[in-house]
Amino acid sequence: FHLSLQSGCDATLKRMNRKYTTKEYERGCELLRKYFVHPAITTDVIVGFPGETQEEFEETLSLLEEVRFDSLFTFIFSPRVGTPAAKMDDPVPMEEKKKWFQRLLDTQNRISVEKHKEYIGRILPVLVEEENPADAVNNLNCRTDGWRLVHVPGDVSLLGQRKKVKI
């Protein structure tokens, strides 16, 4: 499930003209986890939106820790001509935005590794997608229902098939 977050701070969300709060967002994630078995939840975050402060950025990091996304798509804010955000004052220096961006990536990478480790030993259905020529042993790339990449040994005749594999 991909639920667009944009920011983990209500003040930033308001400046973005988003019509939801972080509490409403968290509730949506809770409902997914209540009604689906091990749902993969992904999101996107914009770093350095005009007016974002260090404290607001820290709120986004805190929300990442709280929700524990499976993966994250993140971008440094860049103005688009014709949008309201392009006309906003943007006091955040690019160097600061880059630091925030890296902290966000580092935090999510750690969370993703922790979440991946939870799957070790489990048997999951996968779709065998393509050959993996870079690995002579685990020569097939597969995807779980939660879009996790899994490398397994096998014959190319398995391409396009669904199989169960032990992680």
What are the functions of these language-model segments?
Residues 1-3, 72, 128, 166-167:
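OB-fold and OB-like beta-barrel modules that bind single-stranded nucleic acids
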Residues 1-71, 77-96:
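Conserved non-cysteine loop/helix-boundary elements of the Radical SAM core domain that shape
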Residues 30-36, 71-75, 103-106, 156-162:
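Short C-terminal domain-edge/linker segments immediately following a structured domain
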Residues 87-167:
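Terminal RNA-binding accessory module
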